[in-house]
Amino acid sequence: MERTLTILKPDCVKKQLIGAVINQIERAGFRVVAMKKTRLTKETAGEFYAVHRERPFYGELVDFMSSGPCVPMILEKANAVADFRTLIGATDPAEAAEGTVRKLYADSKGENIVHGSDSAENAAVEAGFFFAAEEVVRSN
């Protein structure tokens, strides 16, 4: 089994879509093995997205991710990273495939409901940013 990290972003929480998005995730065969509701500070959001520090959208991303509560989750499934990225759709909801999370719920490229790790290696690092080992449910 492979794991990936997702974050239901502040726009998802504000629009009261947590349940709808988790339902879509579980219906796609993912198992939630860790989940919490938290609020990132500008500092922690900046640390999490440090890889984008030199990109023009970095400041807006940090501001947005620290603007309200978010829900990080570790998901488990065979081929989790690729399958999850397919489920959520393109970063820009206008370019996302029909039926994807972002096509259904996102308003813009900047406020796009959900983060998904882009590789198994990054998923492991990102999961460790939010969760201690004892917070993760063991696989059966």
Curated annotation (Swiss-Prot):
Metal-binding recorded as keyword: yes
Alphabetical keyword list: ATP-binding, Cytoplasm, Kinase, Magnesium, Metal-binding, Nucleotide metabolism, Nucleotide-binding, Phosphoprotein, Transferase
Claim: Magnesium is one of the keywords in the record: yes
Record: active site: 115 (pros-phosphohistidine intermediate)
GO cellular component, one term: cytoplasm
Cofactor: Mg(2+)
Xref: InterPro entries: NDK-like_dom, NDK-like_dom_sf, Nucleoside_diP_kinase
Location(s) in or outside the cell: Cytoplasm
SMART domains per record: NDK
Binding site for ATP: 9, 57, 85, 91, 102, 112
EC number: 2.7.4.6
GO MF term (any one): ATP binding
GO biological process terms on file: CTP biosynthetic process; GTP biosynthetic process; UTP biosynthetic process
Subunit structure: Homotetramer.
Protein name according to UniProt: Nucleoside diphosphate kinase
Organism, as annotated: Chlorobium luteolum (strain DSM 273 / BCRC 81028 / 2530)
Lineage of producing organism: Bacteria, Pseudomonadati, Chlorobiota, Chlorobiia, Chlorobiales
GN (gene name): ndk
